[in-house]
């Protein structure tokens, strides 16, 4: 594959494997080496913490004054009911909040399909169990659903609402993110003759309110918008006095210990008086293999660590070592 060494490969959406109704695997490739983890970790954090969604935030149950109680004729205690309500997968169209009502009587399970709501609300998991009634008992409740982002504990809202909140209105920890679980894996990828590329595989489980491909698109948009400020730095007027460009990349002036090699590899380099990264990159593979006790495994480790920093063996450095290091060598 021909091209400038400064050109980066751009990933493309390769495959979406729908494992089940709420889980999918999204594969993106090719990525430059190291970018699998860079992008995978950034997208994972955004998908978990920053995706907008809807969640239950408040509940009022007839005959219940606080969450540390129980209701006659209901198998579950109030805390269990609140926990089950957190599992509702809901979407709201055209507004930021909605009030749902639930009234049920007679023995049996109370499910999400028993909830009454207007046309702007969709309950994605209607079979979700909220509680169980025994005998000829009933239960009535009002459920507030709001649109938000991230995770907002009930205690955070309680501090600002305690004075105005009526007795019996129970606050619920709100997890607005539609992504329930996210994990990523980086595998090897190949493009023509290049075999040192990354393939990013994102394994995502949602609550069913968002399509996995749309979730990836939204998270990437959020990341791009946050990085726009850094892109605009190029348009800032440069100062009249430009700093003198250093003769060598600062990373070359750092000690070999900063590479965090294994003890065996580090000791072999020290035995050859290789103290700085600039000393190391000028050596060739053949020269290093002649080093006592340094085998192919150690050589591979050294090459991988250098590659992760954009360096390689066999580089030519004019005027090395610099005067600042000459006295130490």
Curated annotation (Swiss-Prot):
SUPFAM superfamilies: C-terminal domain of RNA polymerase alpha subunit (SSF47789), Insert subdomain of RNA polymerase alpha subunit (SSF56553), RBP11-like subunits of RNA polymerase (SSF55257). Keywords: DNA-directed RNA polymerase, Nucleotidyltransferase, Transcription, Transferase. Its EC number is 2.7.7.6. It is an enzyme of class 2 (transferase). Signal peptide: none annotated. Residues 1-234 are annotated as: Alpha N-terminal domain (alpha-NTD). This is DNA-directed RNA polymerase subunit alpha. The gene is rpoA.
């Amino acid at each position: 594959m021909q091209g400038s060494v400064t050109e980066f490969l751009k990933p493309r959406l390769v495959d979406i494997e729908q494992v089940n109704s709420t889980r999918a695997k999204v594969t993106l490739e090719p990525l430059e080496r190291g970018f699998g983890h860079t992008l995978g970790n950034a997208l994972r954090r955004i998908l978990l913490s920053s995706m907008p969604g809807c969640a239950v935030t408040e509940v009022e149950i007839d005959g219940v004054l606080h969450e540390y109680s129980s209701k006659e004729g209901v198998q579950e205690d109030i805390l269990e009911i609140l926990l089950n309500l957190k599992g509702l997968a809901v979407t709201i169209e055209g507004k930021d909040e909605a009030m749902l009502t639930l009234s049920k009587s007679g023995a049996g399970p109370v499910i999400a399909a028993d909830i009454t709501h207007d046309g702007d609300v969709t309950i994605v998991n209607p079979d979700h169990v909220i509680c169980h009634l025994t005998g000829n008992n009933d239960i009535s409740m009002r459920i507030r659903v709001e649109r938000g982002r991230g995770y907002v504990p009930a205690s955070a809202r309680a501090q600002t609402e305690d004075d105005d909140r009526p007795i019996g209105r129970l606050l619920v920890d709100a997890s607005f993110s539609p992504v329930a679980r996210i994990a990523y894996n980086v595998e090897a990828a190949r493009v023509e003759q290049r075999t040192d590329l990354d393939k990013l595989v994102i394994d995502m489980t949602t609550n069913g309110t968002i399509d996995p491909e749309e979730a990836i698109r939204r998270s990437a948009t959020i990341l791009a918008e946050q990085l726009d400020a850094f892109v605009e730095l190029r348009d800032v007027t440069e100062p009249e006095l430009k700093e003198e460009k250093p003769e060598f990349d600062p990373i070359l002036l750092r000690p070999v210990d900063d590479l965090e090699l294994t003890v065996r590899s580090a000791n072999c380099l020290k035995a050859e008086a290789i103290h700085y990264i600039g000393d190391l990159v000028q050596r060739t593979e053949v020269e290093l293999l002649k080093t006592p006790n340094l085998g192919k495994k150690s050589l591979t480790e050294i090459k991988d660590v250098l590659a992760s920093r954009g360096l390689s063996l066999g580089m030519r450095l004019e005027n090395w070592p610099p005067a600042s290091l000459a006295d130490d060598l």
